[in-house]
């Protein structure tokens, strides 16, 4: 399942779906950060 982050519109996996916690940081250190198009 793929969702779109309401703040940036990037595709993110439900595992990394943090949009429900607020806007994820573009400097997110995680390799699967929403700021990256994997």
UniProtKB/Swiss-Prot annotation:
Residues 19-38 are annotated as: Disordered. This is Natriuretic peptide DNP. It is found in: Secreted. One of its GO terms (cellular component) is extracellular region. The lineage of its organism: Eukaryota, Metazoa, Chordata, Craniata, Vertebrata. Belongs to the natriuretic peptide family. Disulfide bonds join 7-23. InterPro entries: Natr_peptide, Natr_peptide_CS. Exhibits vasodilator, natriuretic and diuretic properties in animal models and human tissues. Acts by stimulating cGMP via the natriuretic peptide receptor 1 (NPR1). Is a poor agonist of the atrial natriuretic peptide receptor 2 (NPR2). Is not degraded by neutral endopeptidase (NEP/MME). Binds to atrial natriuretic peptide clearance receptor (NPR-C/NPR3), which may be responsible of the removal of DNP from the circulation. Increases calcium uptake and induces histamine release from rat peritoneal mast cells. Keywords: Calcium-activated potassium channel impairing toxin, Disulfide bond, Hypotensive agent, Ion channel impairing toxin, Pharmaceutical, Potassium channel impairing toxin, Secreted, Toxin, Vasoactive, Vasodilator. GO terms for molecular function: hormone activity; potassium channel regulator activity; toxin activity. It holds the Pfam family ANP.
